[in-house]
Amino acid sequence: MTTASPRRALDLVFSPAPPPARAGGIGLTVLRIVAGLLWLAHVWWKVPPDFGEARRTGLWFWTHLAVDHPVFPPYSWLVEHLVLPNFTPFGWLVLVVETLLPVLLLTGTAVRLAALIGIGQSLAIGMSVAQAPNEWPWAYAMMLGIHLVLLLAPSAQYAAVDAVRAARIGGDPAPVARRLLGGWGVILALIAILAAVKSLGDELLAPRGSGVGYPPLQLFLGDYNMLAAM
């Protein structure tokens, strides 16, 4: 028993055989959740109603980079002549799409649809900013690769609404649903506890509550006053 675990660990790393299905499923689930958190970090600075157009900041600034530093000239032409003249509707569309993406990925709902949307968004962002100063084009290639994996590989076997939907086809979905709801209950309870602790001493209905997350890694889970935490 004492040698089995190290041997299995070595086999997992060095064996040419595929990893166990469970390990692969868990790894893909982690990749899906990380992708969801990535999109969640993209949402907070897309601020309506003008999305930075008046001050030439925010989404307007990053969108205009497609014109200032073209990656694919036909795309830059579309941005200049179609997107920028209709920027407010475009901003709302981006906000809706990039709010929907993390919701679908983090909850594991319609993951393949989310992956397709993620591929489209990754392409659009990459063609807008990949040639801008201080940008790293390979970051957008990795975003495309991540969503391609999520499209083609089973990344919704665990911690996913899609797993409940799949269980309905093969049998009883209740155990899978209970595990999913229990996991989300624990996560939401932890967020509520953190928000309540950070809001101690604030007014119950403070207009802007304390943020929950880790700013150095651009991980934001929302702002909560004491009432919202409760």
PLM region spans:
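Extended, low-polarity transmembrane helix blocks
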Residues: 2-96, 107-230
